[in-house]
Amino acid sequence: MISVMILVYNVEKYLRDCLNSVIGQTYKDLEIICINDGSTDNSLSILEEYAKKDSRIRIINKKNAGVSAGRNDGIENANGEYLFCVDSDDYIDRDYAQLLYENAKKNNSDFVIVSNFNSWNLDKRVTKKYHSALPTCSMFIKMSILKENKNLRYPLNVQPGEDAIFSHEVLMYAKNVSYEDKANYHYIKREGQVTQNAIKNASTLVKQIEKWFDILDEFYTKNNLWQTKSLSFAKFVEQEAFLAFRTKNFTQDDERKVFDMMKNILKKIMINVNKDDYQYFSKEFICLIESNTIKEYYSIIKYKYNYIRFRFFKQNVSIRYKENRYKLYKNDNI
């Protein structure tokens, strides 16, 4: 059996499409755990309507406590051999669960990654050498890992980044990881999403980045991971905090805070990372590692790599000089 977890909060407009895509799966042995996180619209009524028609649907009705608390409740109530999540405003193809299940069985995987989730190529997020972090709905997890390790839960009072922390920690316990590139997850980006709002609020993001580092610092220390897994922590810093540093419209003070936080944690990380492993980092991130101050970092970026970041028509824009011409990037995408 596979457990499917759907966290629901005020999504009456999208919920039916989500539920229809899950109950219509070609793989039928499902338990569908719907956590109603204190919705104030008709979401609960829709869940109850569907639960009457399909006995596989279980509703957990609770006061609003946030994404992490809701997903943790779902984990505690899951009875399947595997677990995956679908956001309540998204939907999946009919063969989604079947493909992931067959992949896990074929490869004896503890963890299967939906490699083309939301048009993101996640292939370089997890390798034999290191891992960084993944979005919640790109993960297909063997439940025994979560049942045997009660410490592996979503961190409370962290958003955005709660899924990054959770996935990073769970992957430490996964012996076999595989990718599935045929399973299609349809991500619906909409106004009012809690995570999107948190990401847009740069000042909030600064506080969250500090929490990310504190949580993982403690996790690495408790599990004696510094000597063996520091490269993974460095990749987490690069793909989560450094990406935000490069693309978000921080104030000058907040930008300096994020820089200093990254430098402080990297001092602890990089003493356990070999120079040979720098091949896994971007040139810009190596500049950060080798810079002592934010002024020095931007000097290196500007003159060594001809990279300038600024605001242009109220959008985050980068300009890079390459092959005698300038390229304009929005959020580092052409």
Spans of model-derived segments:
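Short aromatic/hydrophobic "clamp" motif used to bind/position activated sugar donors
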Residues: L83
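Membrane-interface aromatic/basic loop that binds lipid-linked glycans or pyrophosphate carriers
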Residues: N249-I334
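Conserved nucleotide-sugar donor-binding catalytic segment
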Residues: R125-V206
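Conserved donor NDP-sugar-binding/catalytic core segment of glycosyltransferases
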Residues: D95-D123
